[in-house]
Amino acid sequence: MLTTTSVGSTTHEPLRLMAIHAHPDDESSKGAATMAKYVQEGVQVMVVSCTGGERGDVLNAAAQELVDQLGIHEVRQREMAEAAHILGVQHEWLGFMDSGFTEGEPLPEDAFALVPLEVSVPPLVKLIREFRPQVVTTYDENGGYPHPDHIQTHVITMAAIQAAADPHAHPELGPSHVVQKVYYNQQFHKARVVALHELLVAQKIESPYVE
């Protein structure tokens, strides 16, 4: 297992990475290979899903029958559990409701994006203090793309990291912890798209990236 030594300390701490995402499936499309790499190297990895993805769309027609039978919430719970198993990561839910991608329409009243920070931040502070990651990954201030849950995930992540480091903030949630590094997922860039396109072409699979 990989370990790190804090400045001024001889104590070796296991390396830990926390990946904070908006919905189940985001962990698989944004950083899955990175997480699998570090798990293989002995790093402890935790995925945190802010919502259950209850208002997501079914893009795979083959899955529609199962969604009709069990409901999208149950299907996404099962998919997340399987993804965590495949990646070899720990997983936690924050339990907020998917806001949906309304594209200009008002958000539902129970939307994660509308939850006050005094409600949404403390559960994440608790997880950070319990898991004690040296590194956190999440989205930038634009959410990677303008989904309200992705933007809100950035907001609560940065607020929780700051609060987790403050021994005077939420002392009831455990001893303070300083996250050493924060990285933003940057999946929408040319090198990644080209690599995906070439891989699909090599496997004789129709590529959506032809243009």
Where do the language-model regions lie?
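Metal-dependent de-N-acetylase/amidase catalytic core
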Residues: 1-20, 104-211
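ATP-dependent adenylation/pyrophosphate-handling site
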Residues: 13-71
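Solvent-exposed loop/turn segments at secondary-structure junctions
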Residues: 24, 54-55, 98-100, 143-144, ...
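A short helix->loop->beta-strand "cap" motif at the edges of active sites that frequently abuts
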Residues: 42-44, 89, 177-180
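A conserved beta-strand->alpha-helix junction
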Residues: 49-51, 84-102
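Acidic/histidine-rich helix-loop elements
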Residues: 56-74, 100-103, 107-113
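Short, surface-exposed alpha-helical segments at coil->helix boundaries
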Residues: 73-77, 81, 154
